């Protein structure tokens, strides 16, 4: 399962200007004139109605694997910085150290124990910040990844797919 919170920068300049305008209108007690988002976005989270391309792209990368992915896209009221929360279920349990070592070895990834936010870590950053969350067991089969990145600087959806590929390949093969 994957939950992705998109910044308004995904809409380009019109998205960032629209959120700034919504905030200004609401802070000054004026009514909203929404033209970009399907609903008020300032101080709100809006579910995306269209299908994500992430699940089909993951299936294309691993045609021999049966990938059951549920993707939920939410439009977040932040200007920059994408947040992705991915729940990973492995076919077989692995030692926690093996998974941690694999995550540390990923290209352009910084594994972090600190609080990750799209404002601090997803704006004007070219790295992909990742937090590994799991039970305290020695061997784990399920874990959560909390990922924060600036898609404008680090690339588009391909980075998420590339990350998934690097994570899944060593585990599945």
Model-derived segments and their meaning:
Residues 1-101:
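Active-site-lining helix/loop region of Rossmann-like oxidoreductase modules
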Residues 68-173:
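C-terminal active-site/capping subdomain that shapes the small-molecule cofactor and substrate pocket
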